[in-house]
Design a protein with these regions (language model features):
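Ribonuclease/tRNase effector modules and their secretory precursors
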Residues: 1-205
Length: 205
């Protein structure tokens, strides 16, 4: 960890070198059966879905329930008006075809209003800009080091917080379990909290 704690802060405006959907920090209160909701427009997991006794529950990335709906007695596989969001699949407009994306659970749908709510919560979680020192900013362009910004934010919100291992005041390290390509890692994020700047991040097994 090469940082002094006084590094200049930079905004990241780059493009993700790999898909953000390959990363996940799952809320600790969700069951292992909860299916990730993949939004192809945002290229990210933006929530989770569980079903029990014909009732569907949808959760945001913080594990808060945002929707409870009861399945009708009879329903089509896809409703072209409301059912516009698929779990683990891609919707081809007008073609009524679903193409599977590996590793994201069974085909399923949620309503337009629930999708809008999840996207709103996803955007709201990024209202405070996360900045980077020069070295971690460079890592954001490297496929083998990159971690999506929203995943770093989740680690900061829900990870274990300890004082900076190097002893700098006002700096803290957050540690959270993270899954990448289906493999479990530990994600460490070191943050200067006065200006919300990432000084170091790394994931390891």
């Amino acid at each position: 960890m090469l940082y002094t704690g006084t590094e200049a802060a930079h905004a990241w405006h780059g493009r993700s070198p790999i898909s953000s959907a390959l990363f996940e920090i799952r809320p600790s209160n969700l069951s292992i059966q909860a299916e990730p909701l993949f939004d192809s427009g945002l290229d990210a997991i933006i929530g989770y879905r569980t079903e029990s006794g014909g009732v569907t529950y949808v959760y945001d990335l913080d594990g808060e329930c945002v929707s409870v709906t009861e399945r009708p007695l009879e329903t089509p596989l896809i409703d072209p008006v409301d059912a516009i969001f698929l779990i683990g699949s891609v919707w081809r407009s007008g073609a009524r075809v679903m193409a599977r994306i590996g590793g994201y659970g069974a085909h399923a749908i949620i309503s337009r209003s629930v999708l809008s709510g999840l996207r709103t919560r996803f955007a709201a979680s990024s209202s405070k800009q996360l900045r980077f020192a020069a070295t971690p900013l460079a890592h954001m362009q490297e496929p083998w080091r990159f971690v999506p910004v929203h995943i770093l934010r989740l680690a900061i919100r829900h990870g274990k917080r300890i004082p900076d291992p190097k002893g700098h005041r006002g700096i803290f390290q957050y540690t959270a379990p993270m899954t990448h390509r289906g493999i479990r890692y530990q994600l460490d994020v070191v943050v200067r909290e006065s200006d919300y700047t990432v000084l170091h991040f790394v994931y390891k097994r």
